[in-house]
A protein has these predicted regions:
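Residues immediately flanking
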Residues: 24-26, 85, 270, 306, ...
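Short, solvent-exposed loop/helix junctions and linker helices
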Residues: 87, 120, 284-287, 340, ...
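Switch I (G2) and immediately adjacent beta-strands of P-loop GTPase domains
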Residues: 48-68, 248-278, 299
């Protein structure tokens, strides 16, 4: 009897395409091969077969593969049909599959969810895979690949093993202490807890993975008609903002996300900053939004008079027909957005600054959920350092282990899993 449904989905690009790969996972995967291809090929070897429906009508000539579980991507029996990628072919093969008993279409992320449920991947790896599927820049790809490949999971396992060792040491002290005497932990025990807590604190101080999705935020600011929109267009390499010799043309915040040298950026063009009491209320709203954007900036390019911009702003001397400011004596960059002179040097400097603020290539980066769980573990270890009663210390170490288990998914809730795997596309 088949208790768990077998699922299938198109796992390659949408038709029309050169090849369409339909993946089938579950207890009826072998039966699906027998029904459509009339045979089961040798495991893990591609074999050419004619696919037919229940009435014997020819559907396609395709490569078929058979992967018996549990050593598969999902931990279940798995079959693949590599068909011609025409829309009608894919529809016909899927129609034949859905007519089989115990077989249904997969939901978004269901293949990955089964891999998680069957222990093929843990939660941190699944989150890394979700990030990898949505990665648009080289830096996003590298960070997601590190987590999907288990870099964070292996590190958490090492931390958990160290906590287990500390817990065993506490239990040993409790077991061999006299009832009359208070049990005491050796001084080295406290040092070891402190070292581990310090290591977790260092990880907690690293840039979060969400920064990669948001990108390094660069806000262009200055008074009206300072050349902000012209430089903005040059940086994003498109006519995203309207440019005009009329002061106050930009009245709202304009954002564009781009990648430079594989690093994600969000460039923000803003309304010109000036006093507008009694003036156009729409322009006043734009100026308020510009000030809000400045408060959230990672870097500010100031195109106004020298020294009048926000603290730590990059002084930019933009050479154009529309600027009439006195020359900047200490400009970080002198450029012409119209001709492009100096823009490349500015981009190079922005990339260097962004690399220091974003997760490093190939380094595992924590998302908000992982950061919260690691923070729980660090908090438990810091608390354990301050305690002298071994029983209380043992409880704090248990709390740290639970936090590690939650981080990699040994203890999870269905709602959280639904949210995660709902991010995946159908067929993954």
């Amino acid at each position: 009897m088949i208790d768990r449904p077998t699922i299938f989905a198109l796992s390659s690009g949408a038709p029309p395409a050169g090849v369409g790969v339909i993946r089938v996972s579950g207890p009826a995967a072998q039966a699906a091969l027998e029904a459509l291809a009339a045979r089961v090929p040798e495991p893990r070897r591609a074999s050419l077969a004619r696919l037919r429906d229940a009435e014997g009508a020819l559907l396609d000539e395709a490569l078929v593969l058979w992967f018996p579980g549990p050593a598969t991507a999902t931990g279940e029996d798995l079959a693949e049909f590599h068909c011609h990628g025409g829309r009608a072919v894919i529809v016909a093969v899927e129609r034949a599959l859905v007519s089989l008993p115990g077989v249904r279409r997969a939901e978004p992320g269901e293949f990955t969810r089964r891999a998680f449920a069957n222990g093929r991947i843990d939660l941190a790896e699944a989150e890394g895979l979700a990030d990898l599927l949505s990665a648009e820049t080289e830096l996003q790809r590298a960070a997601a690949l590190a987590n999907a490949g288990g870099v964070l999971s292996r590190q958490v396992d090492l931390w958990r093993d160290r906590v287990l060792g500390l817990s065993a040491e506490v239990e040993g002290v409790l077991d061999f202490s006299d009832e009359e005497d208070s049990a005491e932990l050796p001084e080295s025990f406290t040092w070891n807890i402190a070292a581990l807590a310090e290591e977790l604190t260092e990880w907690l101080g690293r840039p979060r993975s969400e920064r990669l999705g948001e990108g390094f935020r660069v806000v262009l600011a200055g008074p009206p008609n300072a050349g902000k929109s012209t430089l903005f267009n040059a940086l994003v390499e498109s006519e995203a903002a309207i440019t005009s010799p009329i002061a106050g043309t930009t009245r709202d915040v304009i954002e564009r996300s781009v990648a430079i040298a594989g690093v994600p950026f969000t460039f923000v063009d803003t309304a010109g900053l000036r006093e507008v009491e009694g003036a156009d209320p729409i322009e006043a709203i734009g100026i308020d939004r510009a000030r809000d954007a400045l408060a959230r900036a990672d870097a500010v390019l100031w195109l106004g008079a020298e020294g009048e911009g926000p603290q730590d702003a990059w002084e930019v001397a933009a050479q154009s027909d529309r600027t009439d400011f006195a020359p900047k004596s200490r400009a970080n960059f002198t450029l012409s957005a119209t001709t492009g002179d100096g823009v490349s040097a500015l981009k190079d400097a922005l990339v260097e600054a962004a690399r220091g603020a974003l997760p490093k290539p190939g380094e595992a980066a924590l998302n908000a959920r992982q950061h919260a769980r690691l923070s729980d573990a660090a908090e438990a270890l810091v608390s354990a350092q301050c305690l002298s009663d071994p029983l209380l210390v043992a409880e704090e170490l248990r709390r740290a282990r639970v936090a590690f288990d939650q981080l990699i998914g040994r203890a999870t809730t269905e709602d959280m899993l639904d949210t995660l795997f709902g991010r995946f596309c159908i067929g993954k």
